[in-house]
Regions:
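Phosphate- and other anionic-substrate recognition elements at nucleic-acid/protein interfaces
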Residues: 1-128
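A short, structured active-site edge motif that brings together acidic residues
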Residues: 81-91, 215-222, 280-284
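Catalytic domains of cell-wall/extracellular-matrix polysaccharide-remodeling enzymes
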Residues: 197-198, 219-337, 342-347
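Structural motif
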Residues: 61-64, 166, 312
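A short acidic, amphipathic alpha-helical/loop segment
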Residues: 68-71, 175-176, 201-205, 264-268, ...
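Glycine-enriched alpha-helix->loop->beta-strand junction motifs that scaffold or abut catalytic
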Residues: 77, 183-185, 208-213, 268-279
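Active-site beta->alpha N-cap acidic-glycine motif
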Residues: 135-230, 234, 241, 250
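Terminal accessory/targeting
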Residues: 126-162, 174, 178-188, 300-347
Length: 347
C-alpha cells in the first residue's frame, strides 16, 4: 500500500506519498487552489503507478479539509480521514502537513477512517455531529430569538431562498448562474475562501447579478475540531477574500460546514458578529442521487419561508445544475417566489 497525504495551505494543496514503511516514494507536489481538476488527475496518475507496482493508493486528509472528498471519491480514489487525536498540532493556519498525514496512515492504518460517498468527510462521525447539534438546540434558539440565526423565513409568505454551498467551482457554478440568470431568480452563495480568490470570475459574476455572497469557512472544516482562534481565522480570511474580489465589506452571514456546531462554537460565532445560516430543505445533492431525485426531494420538502440547501462546489455538481430548472419551475407553479437569505421575510 502507498499513502498520499493531502494538506491545505493558505495558497492551495500539498501532496506527499510514502510506502507502507512511511518512506517517501514520490517528490512532494504543490497544487494551486484553483487547480483541483489537475490535482485529481495527478492523484489518478499516482494510483495507476502504484497499481503498476502491485500496490493500491490510499489518499489521506484531515478533518479540516472538507472540499475534496466528493470529487476524489467520484473519480474512483480511495479516501481516508485522519482525526485530531491521531495527529500532531496543526500549524497556525493550515492542516497537518501532507507528509505527516501520509506517514500517520502508513505506520498505523487503523487510525484512519475510509470515507464513503454517502457520508463524505464525516464518515464514522455522523452520530457525533448529530449529538452536538442536539446539544446546541438551546443556544441555537437563543440566537434565533436574537435575530442571529436563521433556518427558515416566515411561514406566512410563499417566499423561499435558494442557497448553494462550497463554491466557487467551475464549471458548475457558472452553469448554476446561467440558470438563475435565465429565470431572473436571486440566490445566496456560501463560498469557501480557499477557492474564492482562485475563481474570482465566478465571484464577480455572482455580485454583478445581485446574488448574496456569504461565508462558508476557508477549508470546510468540522467546526468542533477547531480552536476559537482557528475558527476566527477561517472566517476572517474568507471575508477578506470575498471583499478583495467584490470590493465590499466581507459577509457577516455564515453557514457552518455540515451544520456542525456546539454551544461553545455558537458563542464564538456570536461574539465575532456572525449571523448563522442554517436550512430546512436538504435534497442531499452532494451524494449524487440523480437530477430527478434532487428536484423531487426539494419540491416535496419546501414550505413557505424555506431555505433550500444545494451545492455548487465540493465535486461534480452537474446533477444539481441539471435539476435547478425543474426546481425553479416547480416552485413557481406552486406559487412561490424567491429571495436572497438577507431579504427573506421573517415575520
Amino acid at each position: 500500500m502507498r499513502y498520499c497525504g493531502i494538506a491545505w495551505t493558505e495558497l492551495g494543496y500539498e501532496l506527499a506519498v510514502v510506502d507502507d514503511r512511511g518512506l517517501p516514494v514520490e517528490p512532494p507536489v504543490h497544487v494551486a487552489a484553483g487547480r483541483v481538476p489537475q490535482l485529481t488527475a495527478h492523484l489518478l496518475g499516482l494510483r495507476d503507478r502504484s497499481r503498476a507496482a502491485g500496490q493500491e493508493l490510499a489518499t489521506v486528509v484531515d478533518s479540516t479539509n472538507g472540499m475534496l472528498d466528493g470529487g476524489l471519491m467520484s473519480a474512483g480514489l480511495h479516501l481516508y480521514r485522519a482525526d485530531p487525536w491521531s495527529l500532531p498540532e496543526r500549524p497556525a493556519f493550515g492542516s497537518v502537513a501532507a507528509l505527516t498525514l501520509a506517514v500517520t496512515a502508513a505506520r498505523d492504518p487503523a487510525t484512519v477512517v475510509r470515507l464513503q460517498i454517502e457520508s463524505g468527510t464525516l464518515t464514522g462521525r455522523v452520530d457525533q455531529l448529530e449529538a452536538a447539534i442536539a446539544e446546541s438546540e438551546d443556544a441555537t434558539e437563543a440566537l434565533r430569538q436574537a435575530g442571529r440565526c436563521l433556518a427558515h423565513g416566515s411561514r406566512e409568505h410563499r417566499v423561499v431562498a435558494l442557497t448553494f454551498d462550497d463554491g466557487p467551482n467551475p464549471p458548475y457554478t457558472g452553469r448554476i448562474l446561467d440558470v438563475l440568470d435565465r429565470y431572473q431568480v436571486p440566490a445566496t452563495f456560501f463560498c469557501v475562501g480557499l477557492h474564492a480568490l482562485a475563481h474570482h470570475e465566478e465571484l464577480s459574476r455572482m455580485a454583478a447579478a445581485g446574488h448574496q455572497i456569504a461565508n462558508h469557512t476557508w477549508s470546510h472544516p468540522y467546526l468542533p475540531d477547531l480552536s476559537r482562534t482557528e475558527l476566527a481565522d477561517q472566517l476572517a480570511r474568507t471575508d477578506d477574500a470575498v471583499a478583495q474580489v467584490v470590493g465590499a465589506e466581507g459577509p457577516r452571514l455564515f453557514r457552518p460546514p455540515y451544520g456542525s456546531r456546539t454551544p461553545e462554537v455558537l458563542s464564538w460565532l456570536a461574539d465575532g458578529g456572525s449571523t448563522v445560516a442554517l436550512w430546512d430543505v436538504e435534497p442531499f445533492d452532494w451524494a449524487l442521487p440523480g437530477a430527478d431525485a434532487i428536484t423531487r426531494s426539494i419540491l416535496e420538502q419546501t414550505r413557505p419561508g424555506s431555505v433550500i440547501l444545494m451545492h455548487d462546489g465540493g465535486g461534480d455538481r452537474s446533477q444539481t445544475a441539471e435539476a435547478l430548472p425543474g426546481v425553479i419551475e416547480g416552485l413557481l407553479a406552486r406559487g412561490y417566489s424567491f429571495a436572497r437569505m438577507d431579504q427573506l421575510p421573517t415575520d
